[in-house]
Amino acid sequence: MRAVTIDEFGAAPTVTEVTKPVPGPGEILVKVSHSSLNGFDGAVIYGFLKDALEHKFPVTLGKDFAGTVEAVGEGVGRTAGDRVFGVVMKPVVQDGALAEYVVVGEGYGIAAAPEGLEPAHAGALGLAGSAAVGVIDALAPQQGETVLVIGATGGVGAYAVQLAAKTGATVIATAKPGAETEFVKGLGATHVVDHTGDLAAQIRALSPGGVHAAAHLAGDPVAAAALVAAGGRLASTLGFGPEAATELDITVTSVMANPDPATLERLADAVVSGALTVPIAQTFGLDAVGQGFAAFGAGTVGKIAVTVA
């Protein structure tokens, strides 16, 4: 089968022929139709996770998948032809979703794709969406509160802005002037601040005592924490946790994406109902995925989708 792989850290992703996997007990072979790019993929390429996770080369890149069940291993309840989507969640970095087929476990990182969920949207939903759910659930914004989303134009940020706005909170999003600002406003941001300028001054002008809650998805965590009012909350996807904030009078939570079936189903239902938009900015075919990574590295708004089949 064709897959996007790297043979070593720092190598350019290329489309190569690899062996089609076979599902074992409790596993599902998914024929992938759609995927998307995430920051995790870049971290794998450049070796940023080599001390945290075991890697076995060649590594097939890609976390998000949408497609159909091709075959199942012993003890699996799904059947061939079922529409599914999710996130490849394995302890070793080797198998990924930027491939014609991927094997995943039955119990975690996979859910049924409901009617009305477009495959392209399903393929750009799992990882970033579940991370955003974790962040907003940790912050638990209330109607009338002010929530700052730092890194609002990325995949996680675009979902987080929408989820925060749905709570009735006032959302302040970071974005550059122009297209980025219009993008986050379209997602539900009430105010937009330019993170390339004096962020603290802009926040003070909007919320003099600091914001009630902040989603830290990019930039310096200490600077982000300083923008939160005393007694407020900060949730970070970048490893900033309570142990690093013992002197701060705020509650800090470190969040990792948790794409369990319930979270994936929650995201899918929100998309189908129209409560959540999948913000696909650009779409590339598998053979052009190198261009996709170049666009991702240059910075883009929303998600970069990949059509596999």
What residue ranges belong to the model's regions?
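Residues located in well-ordered beta-strands
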Residues: 2, 14, 31, 66-68, ...
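Short amphipathic alpha-helix with an adjacent loop that forms part of the alpha/beta core around
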Residues: 198-209
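Glycine-rich beta-strand-centered segment in the early N-terminal region that forms part
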Residues: 19-37, 49-90
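Short, glycine/polar-rich helix-capping loops at beta-to-alpha or helix-loop-helix junctions
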Residues: 97-99, 175-183, 241-242, 263
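C-terminal hydrophobic helical "lid"/dimerization subdomain
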Residues: 1, 264-309
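NAD(P)H dinucleotide-binding glycine-rich loop of Rossmann-like/cofactor-binding domains
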Residues: 54, 87-151
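Glycine-rich phosphate-binding loop and adjacent beta-alpha segment
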Residues: 218-279, 308-309
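Mid-domain Rossmann-like dinucleotide-binding core that forms the NAD(H)/NADP(H) cofactor-binding site
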Residues: 80, 122-197
